[in-house]
Amino acid sequence: MKRTFQPSELKRKRIHGFRARMATKAGRQVLARRRAKGRHSLTV
């Protein structure tokens, strides 16, 4: 049985990246929340 986590940098960027977040209203809300909280890193 193979392990479930098979990392792919491309998929990671496309789903969780900055431009993906900026593309939707909800994603922009995520960024706003993380800025308000003072996160050092907003996206992956």
Swiss-Prot record:
GO biological process, one term: translation
Domain of life: Bacteria
The UniProt record lists the keyword Ribosomal protein: yes
Region feature (Disordered): 24-44
Feature: compositional bias, Basic residues: 31-44
InterPro entries: Ribosomal_bL34 (IPR000271), Ribosomal_bL34_CS (IPR020939)
GO MF annotations, alphabetized: structural constituent of ribosome
GO CC annotation: ribonucleoprotein complex; ribosome
Keywords: Ribonucleoprotein, Ribosomal protein
Family: Belongs to the bacterial ribosomal protein bL34 family.
The protein's name in its UniProt record: Large ribosomal subunit protein bL34
